From Swiss-Prot:
Member of the two-component regulatory system HrpR/HrpS that regulates the activation of the sigma factor hrpL which itself induces the expression of hprD as well as other hrp loci which are involved in plant pathogenicity, hrmA and avr genes. Probably interacts with sigma-54. Residues 11-239 form the Sigma-54 factor interaction domain. One of its GO terms (molecular function) is ATP hydrolysis activity. This is Pathogenicity locus probable regulatory protein HrpR. GO terms for biological process: phosphorelay signal transduction system; regulation of DNA-templated transcription; symbiont-mediated perturbation of host programmed cell death. The keyword Translocase does not apply. SUPFAM superfamilies: Homeodomain-like (SSF46689), P-loop containing nucleoside triphosphate hydrolases (SSF52540). ATP binds at residues 39-46, 101-110. The gene is hrpR. The lineage of its organism: Bacteria, Pseudomonadati, Pseudomonadota, Gammaproteobacteria, Pseudomonadales.
Length: 314
């Protein structure tokens, strides 16, 4: 088991910054210890949490709970469950999100977004390893491992009064910081190659080769969406989306084929930046480091839809 976990974490997160970090993930799975994963959006926290569960000795389910997606007004009943007649409209007892993780792993995604009003109640669950359904004082013991993830630095949120200090200390027993992709550029090409190999294998085709033109595009981008954005780029140029016409052109003219693939990547990067910045052009321009008129021109050339009248800007 130890070797499997060690090799798996090394394969997917094989970077100098994680030379000690992968051992933390390994020991968390082996020793059944709670773990806090920290890192920007897209750095692979969800994937690593799921993989740690798979490699652990736990036979129960992996229950992922996005803390940002739970309405605060319904949070208690959704998290802890309710008993019949707990409040108006409750006709039958039901379990919450936490109970099904009994015997398995509870993954608290984006715990940095959890309202303060719920943090104290979550702390009680983590310390007592059990829940009380809303409307009941009966304690339901749970056997679970807890993995939490955060995009914002929890210690800073504590100082700002946005996160409970005692909950932070409870979560901060084992912490793994996943570095941004721009801080481990030596992993861009190996990860991209792994993604294209995986995607190509799914559709029974050969993965595209990393020629010099594509390499320069991949290495020069800062990848603010991190591994998730890199995987999207791999999907964009993988053979499964290639139409027959493009394959025929590439077969006749490799240079033309390369240009078309580069256009696909460029379009994807612009679309991704627009989406993340909600079409805030100033933010997109700063990220892509392009003059305004150049961005407008490239968007028109590539057929990128926008909320702005590009014709008026060209």
């Amino acid at each position: 088991m130890s070797t499997d976990i060690d090799n798996d974490v090394r394969t997917r997160w094989n970077v100098t910054a994680l030379s000690a970090g992968h051992q933390i993930a390994m020991h968390s799975a082996l020793l059944d210890m709670d773990l806090l994963l920290c890192g920007e959006t897209g750095t692979g926290k969800d994937t690593l949490a799921s993989r740690i569960h798979e490699l652990s000795s736990r036979t129960g389910p992996f229950v992922g709970m996005n803390c940002a997606a739970i309405p605060e007004s319904l949070a208690e009943s959704q998290l802890f469950g309710v008993v019949n007649g707990a409040f108006t409209g409750v006709c039958r007892a039901r379990e919450g999100y936490i109970e099904p993780s009994n015997g398995g792993t509870l993954y608290l995604d984006e715990i940095d977004t959890m309202p303060l009003s719920l943090q104290a109640k979550l702390l009680r669950v983590l310390e007592s390893r059990g829940v009380e359904r809303l409307g009941s004082t009966d304690f339901i013991p749970l056997d679970l491992q807890v993995i939490a993830s955060a995009s914002a630095p929890l210690d800073e949120l504590v100082e700002q009064g946005l996160f409970r200090r005692d909950l932070f200390f409870r979560l901060n027993v084992l912490t793994l910081q996943l570095p941004a992709l721009r801080k481990r550029r030596e992993q861009i090409l190996p990860l991209f190659d792994q993604f294209t190999q995986d995607i190509a294998a799914e559709c029974g085709r050969s993965a595209p080769t990393l020629d010099n033109g594509r390499v320069q595009i991949l290495l020069s981008h800062d990848w603010p969406g991190n591994v998730r954005e890199l995987k999207s780029a791999a999907n964009a140029i993988c053979p499964r989306i290639a139409v027959a016409g493009r394959r025929a052109v590439e077969a006749r003219d490799p240079v033309t084929g390369l240009r078309m693939q580069m256009r696909v990547i460029e379009k994807m990067l612009i679309q991704d930046a627009l989406k993340r910045h909600r079409h805030n052009f100033d933010a997109v321009l700063e990220e892509l480091e392009l003059p305004r008129r150049t961005l407008y021109h490239r968007m028109k050339e590539l057929g990128v839809a926008s909320h702005i009248d590009l014709a008026a800007e060209s």
